[in-house]
Amino acid sequence: TCVAALNLDDGKTVWTHEDSWGASYASPILTKIHDRDVALVLAAGESRPAHGGLLVLDPRSGKLLSRFPWRADIYESVLASTPLSISHNQVFISDCYELGGVLLNFSKDFTIQPAWKKRFFGMHMMTPQKIGNYLYGFAGRNIPDTQLKCLNLKNGEILIEDDVRWKEGQRTTGLF
């Protein structure tokens, strides 16, 4: 099972969605796209070749409304950054291994088109934070390739890149 909906009162399964992409580390979210309730699932289980991406499901039935492939061609890659609802028709998803981040535009029939792609704004185990028209997050997989970055949502331009250095046993320099 890739994802399942459970009844909050008794814990029984309401529906399951089977998909070759499989389950991932990313938490599904509920949001609205064009005023319709949807569940966004970033799916990427164990598979050779590696495959996965964004599944858009009806949260009442589990029916697939749309899908967008977005996963590196590396077996060990994971999708762990939770999808981020940006507006009534935009969602940001991320892969840190090869692809980076992508802002997705949704039409009313749930056709998905990338607004922009940014290779070096790939989140690994975190979801970026949206503040105004900007995303802030630690892009990269681990030290030493991780940087604090700020990205303009309108055009995908990276505005800030800070090589935050970690010191063993001390606070992060430059942040606190």
Task: Tell where the protein language model's regions lie, with residue ranges.
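Noncatalytic, solvent-exposed loop/strand surfaces
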Residues: 1-176
